[in-house]
């Protein structure tokens, strides 16, 4: 709840990053218990409140927010490539890490890349 013109931050876990890194990267889709949680055609993970956490795609978030009187200010991939190369990032020296951060901030709102992020931040202003 916020007043008119207030800013709302909503955080989400991304479907695609989980599919790539865990379901494929760790082979989890070969296990029946994980197969049962994933649509075999769309690869959309089941997102039921009974699950540990819910995974979202942008269309899910848009549908969820469509009923509220808000204007989107930013749709941001908060970790983008970082989770895919966590050890590499941890081992960067200060100079390379600074360049990496500049790269991250240059791409974190690109609509063609946000869906690959493990975590997404949606920022709205209440109308």
What are these regions (language model features)?
Residues 46-52, 108-111:
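Active-site rim elements
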Residues 4-39:
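Conserved class I S-adenosyl-L-methionine
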Residues 34-38, 44, 90-93:
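N-terminal accessory regions of S-adenosyl-L-methionine
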Residues 9-12, 72-77:
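A structural signal for short, well-ordered beta-strand segments and their strand-loop junctions
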Residues 49-75:
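Short alpha-helix
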Residues 1-4, 68:
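Conserved helix-to-beta-strand junction in the class I
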Residues 74-127:
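A C-terminal cap/extension of S-adenosyl-L-methionine-dependent methyltransferases
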Residues 1, 10, 116, 120:
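Ligand-binding pocket scaffold of soluble enzyme catalytic domains
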């Amino acid at each position: 709840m916020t007043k008119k013109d207030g800013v709302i931050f909503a955080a989400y876990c991304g479907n695609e990053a989980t599919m790539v890194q865990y379901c494929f990267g760790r082979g989890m889709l070969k296990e029946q218990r994980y197969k049962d949680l994933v649509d075999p055609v769309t690869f959309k993970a089941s997102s039921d409140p009974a699950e540990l956490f819910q995974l979202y795609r942008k269309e899910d978030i848009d549908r969820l927010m469509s009923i509220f009187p808000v204007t989107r200010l930013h749709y941001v991939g908060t970790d983008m490539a970082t989770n895919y190369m966590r050890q590499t990032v941890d081992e960067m020296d200060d100079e390379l890490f600074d360049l990496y951060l500049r790269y991250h901030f240059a791409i974190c709102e690109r609509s063609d890349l946000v869906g690959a992020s493990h975590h997404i931040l949606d920022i709205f202003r209440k109308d």
